[in-house]
Amino acid sequence: MISLTDTQKIGMGLTGFGVFFLFFGMILFFDKALLAIGNVLFVAGLAFVIGLERTFRFFFQKHKMKATGFFLGGVFVVLIGWPLIGMIFEIYGFFLLFRGFFPVVVGFIRRVPVLGSLLNLPGIRSFVDKVGESNNMV
């Protein structure tokens, strides 16, 4: 098992709560307050898990500036009160930022017993195969 420091454990909790609040905010018709809290918790949790320096290095790489602009711009737009537009920017930026991790995630999920069989369903399989391609990594 992977050994985590206390700071990383706090970061995992913050990230988990951030994802929960983002999901819950979208379920409740893009509630501004929940989405704003979720954004702040997610970004803070990421910084706690991988460290401040590595977080800045990840977000501000030269080839990821467009993705970072959309993601952080979306966070800002949500914080000023336009949740639907902000979430569209954020989701686009998130996919641009983290698309290099998708093949790894898809490969892992395919090995999980119940989820792996769900990913092999006819309508879902073609989409997951396209997302899981490793040639579109940045």
From Swiss-Prot:
GO terms for biological process: endoplasmic reticulum to Golgi vesicle-mediated transport; positive regulation of canonical NF-kappaB signal transduction; protein transport; retrograde transport, endosome to Golgi. Its main location: Golgi. Pfam families: Got1. Residues 1-9, 54-68, 110-138 are cytoplasmic. InterPro entries: Got1, Vesicle_transpt_Got1/SFT2. Belongs to the GOT1 family. The modification N-acetylmethionine is found at residue 1. It is found in: Golgi apparatus membrane. It is a multi-pass membrane protein. The gene is GOLT1B. It comes from Homo sapiens (Human). GO terms for cellular component: cytosol; endoplasmic reticulum; Golgi membrane; membrane; protein-containing complex. This is Vesicle transport protein GOT1B. The chain crosses the membrane at residues 10-30, 33-53, 69-89, 91-109. Keywords: Acetylation, Golgi apparatus, Membrane, Protein transport, Transmembrane, Transmembrane helix, Transport. Residues 31-32, 90 are lumenal. May be involved in fusion of ER-derived transport vesicles with the Golgi complex. Widely expressed. Tends to be up-regulated in seminomas compared to normal testis.
